[in-house]
Amino acid sequence: MDKRIYQIDFLKCVFIILMVMFHLVYVGDKFPYAKQVVYTFHMSAFLVFSGYLANMDKGILRFAKQIKWLFVPYAVMESGYVVMASILPIREHIDNLTLVVFLDKLFLHPLGPYWYLHTLIVCYLVYYFVNKLCSRLSLVSFVCLLGVCLFTVSRLLHIVSFDNVMYFLAGVLARRSLVGFTSIFRPSWQAVIPFTLFCVLSPDGMDRSTLQGFVITYLVMSFSLAVYPFLSSRVRRIALFIGENTLSILLFSPIFTIITKSFVPFFAFDPTAVLFTVVSVAFVLGGCYVVVVVMDRLGISRWFCGKKRLLSVPQR
């Protein structure tokens, strides 16, 4: 896929901002049902994008390099998160951090938002080798075989959730069908109607593991794509910039979301939490970009992610 799909960058912007918002403990505690709704679709959509954009038509050395530069930042940040969880009183606090516990979290059961990269690495590995061995199968046969392999990995090794893997598989199916992204995920203002009905009438189905979760993910993507053409050029540039740099936010946002806990007393006068949310999200995004710019200028990015620059500046 040579041409960048800007609609995907826009969707990534929307979902990464929602991720940051509801990783803010104050916001999540104040609006628990909204958090449940957002958790139904935001990372599910990222897995769909990852499956859709995955390119497995490459040699083993190039693929190994790709996996290496996914694993290195994952390992660094997950290691830091695990150590932090053993020190700070966070919800995922580890009471007794041992080497066995550390290795378990790093290789098998990651903590924090880094589970996404862990899942992605596993899915890429399985997808690559199935593609190398069975690429000539029909679309249906290939996707079924890949699904069986991913299901086997999830059930026998218990290192990924099959609920999450299914969204990656959906992205692969969409990509290999050779149909345009917006032909499958059609922009629609009407998508807000069934979405609202699900939220009001079926709160128990708000889980990414349910059929309703799949439908909700599709509806939110569809509605968001309907909004995209109406963005002003300035808003669009900002959104696409954020969308192209979601990896930086995923990697470094936990550092800054913890700091935002200290902001709560200053916004106690606002019962809606809107001001707290706006300031905190801007702080987290800005902090992530500052870290990345410093890494780029010091030459750390080359050793951290295999690229001279981790920060991507869109060329429109």
Give the positions of each predicted feature.
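Alpha-helical transmembrane segments and their immediate juxtamembrane cytosolic regions
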Residues: M1-R316
